[in-house]
Regions:
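N-terminal amphipathic/basic-hydrophobic helices that include classical n-h-c signal peptides
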Residues: 1-7
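Nucleotide and nucleotide-moiety/phosphate-recognizing core
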Residues: 9-150
């Protein structure tokens, strides 16, 4: 398999920004549209994810028009009723199968954690390549972060 440093590997990965939650702990609304340092949290996530993948989509629930100015493919959960982040992962997989069947991997980035590493996708890709695994998730401080994953 090609190492992530190879541009072909990056081009064959679709990034899925996960923004489909209810934001219950923050009183509802779109967490990713909150401002942080003069940009939305979503824009911070877009800025970090874009150079790591060949294509980037935004997974949401609700009215897609509120995200239209981001110029991303916007995909609503295939499973209704705010089923959780795995519904966004599944939706991303379905979108890739339909729109980019040549891509073998998706990398998921939750939009409520915008300061993920700039080499996250490459580390995840290398983990699945080195271990001949079917998926990998991020870990730090002895804890797993499964929403940051390659699938």
């Amino acid at each position: 398999m090609k190492r992530m440093g190879d541009s072909m590997a990056c081009e064959n990965i679709v990034g899925v920004l996960l923004a489909g939650g209810k934001s219950r702990r923050m009183g509802g609304g779109d967490k990713c549209l909150l401002q942080l340092g003069g940009k939305t949290i979503l824009q911070h996530a877009i800025d970090r994810a874009t150079p790591q993948v060949g294509n980037l989509i935004l997974n949401i629930n609700g009215d897609p028009d509120r995200f239209s100015h981001y110029n991303l493919n916007i995909v609503s959960d295939d499973i209704g009723n705010f089923a959780g982040p795995l519904a966004g992962v599944l939706t991303g997989m379905h979108w890739v199968k339909e729109n980019h069947p040549e891509c073998k991997w998706i990398v998921t980035f939750p939009t409520d954690t915008p300061f993920f590493p700039m080499d996250l996708a490459s580390k995840l890709y290398d983990a699945v390549s080195d271990n001949k695994a079917e998926l990998a998730c991020a870990a730090s401080g002895g804890r797993h972060h499964p929403v940051f994953g390659i699938w």
